[in-house]
Design a protein with these regions (language model features):
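Charged docking surfaces used in two-component/phosphorelay signaling
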Residues: 16-24
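Short hydrophobic/Thr-rich beta-strand motif most characteristic of the beta2 strand and flanking loop
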Residues: 26-33, 41
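Active-site beta3 strand of CheY-like receiver
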Residues: 45-51, 56
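Alpha4 helix (beta4-alpha4-beta5 surface) of REC/receiver domains from two-component response regulators
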Residues: 19, 63, 86-103, 114
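The feature encodes the CheY-like receiver
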Residues: 15, 57, 75, 87
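Acidic catalytic/metal-coordinating carboxylates
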Residues: 34, 60-66
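C-terminal output helix
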Residues: 107-117
């Protein structure tokens, strides 16, 4: 059975790229495009891995990550944070909230694939 990745991202080109990269490697990729109800989607789908954009409409990725780490059934789900802002303070905030890995956009296909494989233990 394919492992599931939940991609929470609002940029269509990033969604398309991640779906392409991961589906070719056998991953099932589910997508969600806003922060409003992202945590409800996470709780109902319980993916093997979450790829979470920092800047989303409705709620920031940081707020979503904080809620993920306060939800017992989601504590062990690895979270890869994506951002166009790769400043030290952004990395530190994500790390303090419990991200598993931080990646800046743009990224290469191989960078994304390596990160997902590492985090999901594949």
């Amino acid at each position: 059975m394919a492992k599931t990745v939940l991609l929470i991202e609002d940029e269509p080109n990033i969604i398309e790229a991640v779906q392409y990269i991961l589906s070719r490697d056998g991953w099932q990729v589910k997508t969600h495009a806003n922060g409003h109800d992202a945590n409800a989607v996470i709780k109902t789908s319980l993916p093997d891995l979450i790829i979470l954009d920092v800047m989303l409409p409705g709620k920031s990725g940081y707020d979503i990550l904080r809620e993920i780490r306060l939800t017992p059934e989601c504590l062990e789900i690895p979270v890869l944070m994506l951002t166009a802002r790769g400043q030290t303070k952004d990395r530190q905030m994500a790390e303090a909230l419990g991200e598993s890995r931080f990646m800046t956009k743009p990224f290469s296909n191989q960078e994304m694939l390596d990160a997902v494989r590492e985090l999901a233990g594949a």
